[in-house]
Amino acid sequence: MKIALIPGTFDPFTIGHLELVKIASSLFDKVVVCILVNPNKTHLFDEDARLSMIRRSVEAFSNVSVDIDHGYTADYAKKIGAEYIVRGIRNEIDAKYEMEMADFNLKRTGVRTLLIPAPEEIAGISSTRVREELKQGNSVEALVPEEIKSVL
């Protein structure tokens, strides 16, 4: 069974994240979307809210599950038997960073990383942008999955 991990903070989950799930679910037998908790970050949504948002968004995918972990990405990938860590890249800055992390994770645990470029029409969408729009009182309906619009 080919298992993939999609890690992130998902604060909140966006249509960019959902696109990554769609692609990964078609490539792998099992996909785990894992909220990785960084205690040094301040979050707009708590762990339970993010878990609920993601579960609602991915419930149509029978081979996708959602989890929370407080450790390192590569360690969690190894723990669940993932062969790949799946990451989206929106621009050259993302690509450079993700390539460095992919190399680190491969050397540390032997887990490979699959980098998937974001389609141009959603490349500008990020959780940071959603949080900024929410703080300014703007609509985020075009940025988040249908299943969580009512929560935001």
Q: Which residues make up each language-model segment?
A:
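Nucleotidyltransferase catalytic core that binds NTPs
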Residues: 1-152
